């Protein structure tokens, strides 16, 4: 059955809110709606799961091999190593590069903690850099200032669905002989356009790309999952070994590894959803366009920008609130049963886990400015126009009441 009508990407209206005496039926608004996304592809997913159950090949079965192959073809990259989750993907990537305790790894502070958590876990030294106030991705000038003789790797994060400035990052990495690991957990399917017109998928430009298939992601499993990818066969083979107890052959362990596998059921589900990823991303882009148009006349809202070098797949629709009490804004929406989230309320350099490094005078002005004012609105593939109208009117009513 066709999920969306032929005139647009929004699904048909569902079941309520009252507006000018009219009742509009509406589903409960959620930040993420994995249930209805599943229901839209239920037959395909159920059959894929049943196929795995019928073969009983639960670990590294055909579904895993098929998904790895299909993901590689989609991304345009040679080697894909599936693993248990996105955090493992980052950890395995760093382990494969033979980084040593005390080596410095540069990451943005304004991101989810997993990016930096694995750096500390491996006894490497995290070096926090600032982000661009428009894209929320790694700031190039801040990156340049952070490089020292101890720097060994850069981990740019394609935050919220927008690509980091990879061309400049790769140039800097080449100049200083540094590794680049792309954290692509929030931007799978996004395109990056180089100055010469070359287009590549995010996650495929550095030495290694890492992603997460957490259920809320643009390409989400029905549990945990992740993957690492590279065009370097030596690195790919080593990452595959590390992900499987460091084994080169069964019971022969060449390197210290871990146990990090994507199971066949999750791979089978992801294989179904991978074929729909571009459609899912277009649905998110349509939601974002609706929001941006609705908020165009509100000076206190800074809507997400899209750079000329990057598409945006809107894992999150994150706004900045200028001169506004964010807690009052959130409470106003909550009273209307409109959820919103703060990604992220505490940046990496201020987390308690890095308390010993907080004596360092980090020059992260943009990060410090963004943290108190960002707010993310609901965005997912199953939103309909009734919900979007209700959300945007709810946001607008907050600013109308202030006037």
Predicted segments, located by residue:
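N-terminal "arm"/small-domain region of PLP-dependent enzymes with the aminotransferase-like
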Residues: 18, 25-57, 62, 378
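PLP-dependent aminotransferase class I/II
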Residues: 35, 64-70, 74-80, 141, ...
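Conserved active-site segment immediately N-terminal to the catalytic lysine
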Residues: 182-220, 249-254
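PLP-dependent aminotransferase-like
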Residues: 95-191
